Amino acid sequence: MSAPSRFDRGHTDDLMTFLSASPTPYHAVASAAARLEKAGFRQVAETDAWEATSGGKYVLRGGAIVAWYVPEGAAAHTPFRIVGAHTDSPNLRVKPRPDTGAHGWRQVAVEIYGGPLMNSWLDRDLGLAGRLSLRDGSTRLVDVDRPLLRVPQLAIHMDRNVSTEGLKLDKQRHLQPVWGLGDSVRDGDLIAFLEDEAGLARGEVTGWDLMTHSVEPPAYLGRDRELVAGPRMDNLLSVHAGTAALASVAASGADLPYIPVLAAFDHEETGSQSDTGADGPLLGGVLERSVFARGGSYEDRARAFAGTVCLSSDTGHAVHPNYAERHDPTHHPRINGGPILKVNVNNRYATDGSGRAVFAAACEKADIPFQTFVSNNSMPCGTTIGPITAARHGISTVDIGVAILSMHSARELCGADDPHLLANALVAFLQP
């Protein structure tokens, strides 16, 4: 898996392992939690009373995780330094009545999640993974990581104009994957199949949150293998970098003036409005309870929040060699050119001048370059959890990330060096 580079590729090798182990947000937070556990962090339950103890802690809620490290002697009003990211990616998700079919084909009824590049999901070997809710109230993760499903494209002989007029897909009729032959009801019991896969008794599963994923593993690409192709880089690349950075800072034993935090949310791709999304109460609740657990008052909470800074880390757009005119003519982020700072004067990104200075200082300390992304004026600008975090919590927030190609494809493309550079910048930010 290793590739030659002027930089250490160990981080990128580990990213590829993380991507493969994290086909869903639920698996992603489990993977992050396992890495933090190895670094000495421990899980705390939201239903328990929290103690005023130092060290690393984390909260899991669905497909979200908030982790933080309290240094020895931290005051109740000690500010936070937060790395924010999201765990979800566009895909196809299984409907409540999953079994369907037609003309002798067994199919799975799916709904489109987020804004995927749907052509990238056609004729691709897909697995199925997610969370099963059981009759006893517990949950179980499941991952069928082998070719199970496929959305077959119509042959060109039956769609003669596809190459000249473009691919046209009806979201309801054309995207239901096949997974075998037979009667859709008698032979197509998907949940029974998953119960067998998970080693559960029939009828034990009473609810599910299931989604498709490409089973093709991440891989180095190019003559010098300076590129990485893989799924869910938007935005597990940032989740992985943030997890590694937080673990590194906690292990350093340094005298920290801030409490470093990782907040990885679900549902960014659909607006963040959920109890596990950035527009929900999770982050604010964790930060407040951390202040109060250390004997703080509401005044201490206000002081801590006033001094807090968040880096909202999400992937951005590298200049595309075939579509360079879609970019701002004076801002062309390049692959392996270092992390990007995202700016939009209409507050689609949260970055302002003071935020730029914070990120520039972190990159200077880490001795790495950074680039700036601004949208072409003639095209709408996307957004992130950054403006939501700034507005909801009154926290100074800066939008950053790594430039990639093919964002929202089933298989995206990044530079092999950029993930490592991002992680180094995050370490320097969390440990100024």
UniProtKB/Swiss-Prot annotation:
It comes from the Bacteria. Its EC number is 3.4.11.-. The keyword Protease applies. One of its GO terms (molecular function) is aminopeptidase activity. One of its GO terms (biological process) is proteolysis. CDD domains: M18_DAP. It is an enzyme of class 3 (hydrolase). Pfam families: Peptidase_M18. One of its GO terms (cellular component) is cytoplasm. Its cofactor is Zn(2+). Disulfide bonds: none annotated. Signal peptide: none annotated. Keywords: Aminopeptidase, Hydrolase, Metal-binding, Metalloprotease, Protease, Zinc. Zn(2+) binds at residues 86, 157, 408. The keyword Magnesium does not apply. InterPro entries: M18_aminopeptidase_2, Peptidase_M18, Peptidase_M18_dom2. NCBIfam families: PRK02813.1. Belongs to the peptidase M18 family. This is Probable M18 family aminopeptidase 2. It comes from Streptomyces coelicolor (strain ATCC BAA-471 / A3(2) / M145).
